């Protein structure tokens, strides 16, 4: 619908490996890229919380999921780039004479976005991603993380682009914006006073990104000039 009513806007589509064969997913993505005139970006979401994955029947561990994503993207890229049918055999996927008659408009393939900053995630993202998606953290931490990711990418003869996600809170004046922020916090605390930062097992966050944000909250309400973090995690 969005693509039909726009001409230049890029479409960022979230896609979770593990529930569709990578060969089939590669053909679907290439087809969609053709239908919307080469405006598709694909954000690979591996999944950082066991309970969320298990609701959909995925019982692999956190690190196993990232290992599977690595294979998934190897196969997808093979479908997009190989001129001849190819075979693949890994721990999670096997295919024989995989190919696609449809190729994406964007070459060599639809740009890949990736998220995750755990020890299992970073090597996979640095190997495959075109754009690495990060959450808003203090400048020093973002700079350190970007340097680590670029170092990992360089080991694969690659260079990453980055997306940094913030949720701006706006007001007619700075004071009004701060009043609005604290009103939002009061609403969050009223609706979930005991559950914030706690997962289904009753423990702290499983995902490394969530753990980083939780530690950030413990460091103070405002960081840098106006990075406000009480509801970051």
Where are these regions (language model features)?
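Hydrophobic faces of well-ordered beta-strands that scaffold small-molecule active sites
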Residues: 11-15, 40-44, 112-115, 130-134, ...
